[in-house]
């Protein structure tokens, strides 16, 4: 008898709960919260001053390459850490002074690392200012046609 009373009480309470949840879910406009295939990327606010990266015209080439190696590994964003550190490990030692300057401008001239990621993965168009030989090499590197596993940064 007690078992029948409890089972009927549970059935009545869950029916009401189920009705309430279904009613709430049906009122929810799901398109407001999902963006299939769309990137959520807001413009940087104009009221936040972004300091310009200081130019280092007298920096020796080897010192510049060492600095760029470090900066490529410490982006603060895992995606770029992996992409840029593997790119630098493969190409930086063979860069001439002009290519090194282009790479320096790319990783230090852009204020938002997501921009570098979107350009390299060709999710967004690269601005003409950064669309150079180094960016083309980076885009080719990101395609990973050799199917190299890039789950960690290369050893120093």
From Swiss-Prot:
Pfam families: Sdh5
UniProt cross-references to InterPro entries, sorted A to Z: SDH, SDH_sf, SDHAF2
Classification via SUPFAM superfamilies: YgfY-like
Subunit structure: Interacts with the flavoprotein subunit within the SDH catalytic dimer.
UniProt record similarity statement: Belongs to the SDHAF2 family.
PANTHER family referenced in this protein's UniProt entry, alphabetically: PROTEIN EMI5 HOMOLOG, MITOCHONDRIAL, SUCCINATE DEHYDROGENASE ASSEMBLY FACTOR 2, MITOCHONDRIAL
Protein name, as recorded: Succinate dehydrogenase assembly factor 2-B, mitochondrial
